[in-house]
Amino acid sequence: MNRLPLVAAQPGIWMAEQLSSLPNAWSVAHYTELKGNIDAPLLAKAIVEGMRQADTLRMRFVQENGEVWQWVDDAMSLPEPSVVRAESHDVAMALMAADLNQNLRVDSGQPLAFHQLIQVGEGHWYWYQRYHHLVVDGFSFPAITRQIAAIYRAWQNGEPTPASPFTPFVEVVEEYQRYRD
């Protein structure tokens, strides 16, 4: 295990979550509306591959003697998202709200990354994504979405999996520490 310190906004997020009584204050989520013929099993596999490429989504956190550490758990498996059918937009929104309104603190035991494909009609889908803010930021969240979409398109066309655009997190930490020094 390569223990890494919290960097950039992470210490503030960690501390704010410790001080907050809210069970989900540091969860970030959105859904993307998809229309047309979606190969849901293929998209589900592309989601797993895209998440695998972003090592921060396999991050674990521990607090020891007042210090917080994180590490990439290479053995962590990322499950395929569930594929569900909802009778309407309102039912789909209720499914997403139910996920987002549970205890999603970093120590809750809930996954720090969660995806769901919700079919709301023929050729009409919502792709729901939820992350803990310790593992994504405003740049990486849409970057992960774009990479998953690129993987899905490539696989639909029989092309190889696109290379990961993500810098390994250990290199991000090293660069951050050089900048701070």
What kind of feature is each model-predicted range?
Residues N2-V72, H89-R180:
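Acyl-group handoff/entry surfaces in thioester-processing enzymes
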Residues D74-S82:
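Short, charged/polar, Gly/Pro-enriched secondary-structure boundary elements
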Residues V84-A86:
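Short acidic-hydrophobic, aromatic-tinged amphipathic segments that line or gate anion-handling sites
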